[in-house]
C-alpha cells in the first residue's frame, strides 16, 4: 500500500544519508536538515565563504547537531543568528508553534568575530524593530562553556544576554561530583525511540494504559 511504499522510500533515503560525511546524523531522529547543514558548510569557501540559510531551531539546540555547531563556532569568523516564532504563520504557512532560525555565517577574516543572537520575534513588526537593536556578541568560549552540547539558547530580551552570562558562572546541571546532588534531564515518551514499549493492537491488555 501507500504506507509501505513511503516506508521503503524513507528507509532507502536514510541508508543513503548514512553513507555520507554528516557527523552526528546518527544521533536522535534522522532529519534531513542535519545533512543539508553540513553540505552548506562543506561547499562554502574556507577563505571568503559566506552562508545565509533558514533552518529549524533544533539545528541550534538538538544533540544531533552538536558536532555541526562546534564546527561552526570553532571555524567560522562570525555567526549571526535570528530566531522567528511562526505565531499566526507570519513567516511560513506551516505549524505556527515552530521556531525558525536565520543563520548568517562568515568565513572571511576581518569580519566581526563571535556569535550574536536575536529573537525570537513573533511578528513582522517585532522583527523590524528588533533587528535594528545591537545584540551582545558572545565569544566562542562563552558559548561553548554554557553546556556540553554547544546548544544556543533563546534570548527574548536584549538584557537576556547579561542574565545568561550571570547564569554561566554556576556549574552545569549535568555536573557529577561525589557527595553532591545531581540533576538529570529526561525527555518525554518518544514515539520513535520508545516504540518497543508501545502496543498498537486494537485491544488494551491488562496493565497497559490507553493513549
How would you name each of these model-derived features?
Residues 1-23, 43, 47, 75, ...:
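Polynucleotide-recognition surfaces of large bacterial nucleic-acid defense/processing enzymes
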Residues 25-37, 113:
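Phosphate/oxyanion-binding active-site loops and adjacent basic polyanion-contact surfaces
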Residues 36-39, 67-72:
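Structural preference for long, well-ordered alpha-helical segments in enzyme cores
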Residues 54-55, 84:
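Short His-Asn-centered micro-motif
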Residues 55-60, 89:
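Conserved short loop/turn motifs at secondary-structure junctions
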Residues 57-59, 70-78:
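Active/binding-pocket-proximal capping segment
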Residues 62-68, 92-94:
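A short acidic (Asp/Glu
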